[in-house]
Amino acid sequence: MAVSDPIADFLNRIKNGQKARFDKVDIPASRMKASLSRILKEEGYIKNFKLIKDDKQGIIRVQIKYGEHREGAITGIKRVSRPGCRVYVGHDEIPRVMNGMGIGIVSTSKGIMTDRQARKEGIGGELLCSIW
């Protein structure tokens, strides 16, 4: 069965894997999910990710990051723009997540980037999700 919201599926697999204390989670690959994984790694929310080729679309293997007491690096994830209700924001309307303690991920004309990068470059776009 096809997934109606692949980004929400990506975020939920990471969240559920962290709650179940898995070391890694396998997710069906796409370019957008690879970009999201790259941002999560750069911001320190996941340890690493690896693209694995297979006969179909490929797999992204995400290594989940934990603290010294096995608490997850991700406290919360919220999907903002959904297929049924898209949310677009200008560069001056991008909200700060947890007063700057979290990140917002924005899909812009220059690619997928964090809320800080979008504000710095002065471009808005679709607000995909918030992570803290």
UniProtKB/Swiss-Prot annotation:
It comes from the Bacteria. The keyword Ribosomal protein applies. GO terms for biological process: translation. PROSITE patterns: RIBOSOMAL_S8 (PS00053). GO terms for cellular component: ribonucleoprotein complex; ribosome. Pfam families: Ribosomal_S8. HAMAP family: Ribosomal_uS8_B (MF_01302_B). Belongs to the universal ribosomal protein uS8 family. Part of the 30S ribosomal subunit. Contacts proteins S5 and S12. One of the primary rRNA binding proteins, it binds directly to 16S rRNA central domain where it helps coordinate assembly of the platform of the 30S subunit. This is Small ribosomal subunit protein uS8. It comes from Syntrophobacter fumaroxidans (strain DSM 10017 / MPOB).
